[in-house]
Regions:
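Hydrophobic helical h-region of N-terminal Sec-dependent signal peptides
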Residues: 22-28
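N-terminal signal peptide c-region/cleavage motif recognized by signal peptidases
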Residues: 30-32
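Bacterial N-terminal signal peptides that target proteins for export
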Residues: 4-22
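OB-fold and OB-like single-stranded nucleic-acid-recognition modules
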Residues: 35-188
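Charged/polar, low-hydrophobicity segments characteristic of intrinsically disordered regions
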Residues: 2-9, 132-136
Length: 188
């Protein structure tokens, strides 16, 4: 085989078509490997250029006298979403992506795994603070799921992103994804 390859690259005019054919074949085989690598996104990439950026409403409790109000808020109806119809980046539709974030469970199995959840940019979104704009929420479906007790850490989610709105009891999402990989986010 090596002898045959060396002969192809020897440079004689009669053997150049074989060399071109071999190179074309190698490119065809290697292209899907490059294409399979997901595009790493951050949360600002989900906001269209020129669209207003809505800062998160993170209201920490500094005054202990407000503690009873906060505890009663836990049983109150969910806070209103900041921008339920925020614009989305249509060019991301169908792209293979990788996005870090926190998991907000929508469905939990008897085994304690969530297989349908919202991916959000910061911890506590939709639960302790109002939901972020819809273009900052991805509705995730996953066969493998994530254990509920592991929800306090951020995760990388990989899969094909769809620009498709969805609604849940907690918030509206501007994107959806069928998770192909879920793994812990670690600082570099």
């Amino acid at each position: 085989m090596i002898k045959h390859l060396t002969a192809c690259f020897a440079g004689t005019p009669a053997k150049r078509p074989a060399m071109h054919m071999l190179l074309a074949l190698l490119l065809l085989v290697a292209m899907p490997l490059w294409a399979a690598e997901p595009k790493e996104l951050d949360w600002p990439a989900l906001i269209p250029e020129g669209a207003p950026v809505v800062p998160p409403q993170l209201t920490p409790l500094h005054d202990m006298s407000q503690l009873s109000n906060a505890l009663s808020a836990e049983s109150a109806p969910p806070a209103r979403q900041q921008a339920p119809d925020a614009p989305v980046v249509k060019s991301l539709d169908g792209q293979q992506v990788k996005l870090p974030g926190y998991i907000v469970p929508l469905e939990v199995s008897e085994e304690g795994r969530t297989t349908e959840f919202l991916l959000v940019p910061y911890y506590g979104a939709c639960i302790h603070v109002p939901p972020p704009p819809s273009n900052q929420i991805v509705h995730i479906f996953s066969e493998m799921g994530v254990r509920v007790e592991d929800l306090y850490q951020p995760y990388w989610i990989e899969g094909k992103l769809q620009v498709r709105a969805s609604s849940s009891e907690l918030a509206d999402a501007g994107y959806q994804m069928e998770a192909e990989k879920i793994y812990a986010y670690e600082l570099r």
